[in-house]
UniProtKB/Swiss-Prot annotation:
Binding sites annotated in the UniProt record for [4Fe-4S] cluster: C270, C273, C305, E312
Necessary cofactors: [4Fe-4S] cluster
InterPro entries referenced in this protein's UniProt entry, alphabetically: Dihydropteroate_synth-like_sf, Enolase-like_C_sf, IspG_bac, IspG_bac-typ, NO2/SO3_Rdtase_4Fe4S_sf
Primary gene name: ispG
Pfam short name (any one): GcpE
UniProt cross-references to NCBIfam families, sorted A to Z: ispG_gcpE (TIGR00612), PRK00366.1 (NF001540)
Catalyzed reactions: (2E)-4-hydroxy-3-methylbut-2-enyl diphosphate + oxidized [flavodoxin] + H2O + 2 H(+) = 2-C-methyl-D-erythritol 2,4-cyclic diphosphate + reduced [flavodoxin]
Family: Belongs to the IspG family.
Single GO MF annotation: 4 iron, 4 sulfur cluster binding
Note on cofactor: Binds 1 [4Fe-4S] cluster.
Taxonomic placement: Bacteria, Pseudomonadati, Pseudomonadota, Gammaproteobacteria, Alteromonadales
Pathway linked to the protein: Isoprenoid biosynthesis; isopentenyl diphosphate biosynthesis via DXP pathway; isopentenyl diphosphate from 1-deoxy-D-xylulose 5-phosphate: step 5/6
Protein name, UniProt field: 4-hydroxy-3-methylbut-2-en-1-yl diphosphate synthase (flavodoxin)
Length: 376
């Protein structure tokens, strides 16, 4: 098994979104977007804090009006995670939230207006040390680009992005990242591949308007997986018509599956068949809910029989292999004398997983202390 990802990431510049680095050798960040009314400060703050609690590195907030900008001011005071203001149509809103300490400005080339307006936003961003995201979307391209290509194409999205990259370059502004999102997987993937060849700025990945929880997760996993596996991407957002918390979970699961960022339990489980010695599906479903709060990276295998069970368990931090009445238990790849009663697996597994997580976390903390002392 690969313990580390074989993926070689594309070389990119690094920018700072608040205190979070994006690009360069920084970990790929996972972000989401609030779906509350921004003018409802209490609801928006509560959702941002919930997103932060499940691991969101960055949160984007829509700011469609000046009233929303005033609400954003209050929201920013009450949260710790870096906030991106999502700006469309009225560039003056970007200028206003810049005064209120926004950590990044997202502007849409398709509707932000002419170069003079962009210049105003850039100058304000520079004065306040705020990065910008050029956020191209296949559904809102500039009118002349729509007329030129008649429909969204990779070349159309690239032209829109490069038009605004060139503007920022002429203004000698380098603190920006770029996205070229589309709801079609192939369109998005090809657009990002073209863009990655043209610039070295950080890339924000996403399949826009991907769909509901199941279908959107699949589309996003396929699209982002294709790009990330080629080393493309510095920050990701999973766009789902679902609770934004699910976007963070899916985002981390994608990175975990590619070994690009480890966080939480990597649960390896068989789909079950007539050979299973215990109810694998119900065990895994119950266990997932019990251990989703554990952040320590760990491989746990739950296999219902002895065909693949021992092999998976031997390369896992903790493994269970189904056997009649009592199942075999492995720790660090070594079979233990202890066996688990098949009628009480979830409680037993949760206890062992939590104990193992504590042990691994303590070892990691000790290693980090040694590394710091060595560097000093």
């Amino acid at each position: 098994m690969f313990k580390e990802s074989p993926i070689i990431r594309r070389v990119s510049r690094q920018i700072m979104v608040g205190n979070v680095p994006v690009g360069g050798d920084a970990p790929i960040t996972v972000q989401s977007m609030t779906n509350t009314l921004t003018t409802d400060v209490a609801a928006t703050v509560a959702q941002i804090k919930a997103l932060e609690a499940v691991g969101a590195d960055i949160v984007r907030v829509s700011v469609p009006t000046m009233d929303a900008a005033e609400a954003f001011r209050e929201i920013k005071k009450q949260v710790n995670v870096p906030l991106v203001a999502d700006i469309h149509f009225d560039y003056r809103i970007a200028l206003k939230v810049a005064e209120y300490g926004v950590d990044c400005l997202r502007i849409n080339p398709g509707n932000i207006g002419n170069e003079n307006r962009i210049r105003s936003v850039v100058e304000c961003a520079r004065d306040n040390n705020i990065p910008i995201r050029i956020g191209v979307n296949g559904g809102s391209l500039e009118k002349d680009i729509q007329e030129k290509y008649t429909e969204p194409t990779p070349e159309a999205l690239l032209e829109s992005a490069m038009r605004h990259v060139d503007i920022l370059d002429r203004l000698n502004f380098n603190e920006f990242k770029v996205s070229v999102k589309a709801s079609d997987v192939f369109l998005a993937v090809e657009s990002y591949k073209l863009l990655a060849k043209q610039i070295d700025n950080p890339l924000h990945l996403g399949i826009t308007e991907a769909g509901g929880l199941r279908s959107g997760s699949v589309k996003s996993s396929v699209g982002l997986g294709l790009l990330l596996a080629q080393g493309i991407g510095d920050t990701i957002r999973i766009s789902l018509a679902a609770d934004p918390i699910e976007e963070i979970k899916v985002g981390f699961d994608i990175l975990k599956s590619l070994k690009l960022r480890s966080r939480g339990i990597n649960l390896i489980a068989c789909p079950s068949c007539s050979r299973q010695e215990f109810d694998v599906v119900s065990t895994v479903n119950a266990l997932e809910q019990r251990i989703e709060d554990i952040m320590t990276p760990m491989d746990v295998s739950i296999i219902g029989c002895i065909v693949n069970g021992p092999g998976e368990a031997m390369v896992s931090d903790l493994g269970l292999t189904g056997s009649s009445k009592k199942s075999g238990y492995y720790l660090d790849g070594i079979r233990q004398k202890e066996r688990f009663d098949n009628t009480d697996l979830v409680d037993q597994l949760e206890q062992r997983i939590r104990a193992k997580a504590r042990s691994m976390s303590e070892r990691l903390d000790e290693k980090n202390k040694i590394d710091i002392l060595t560097k000093d």
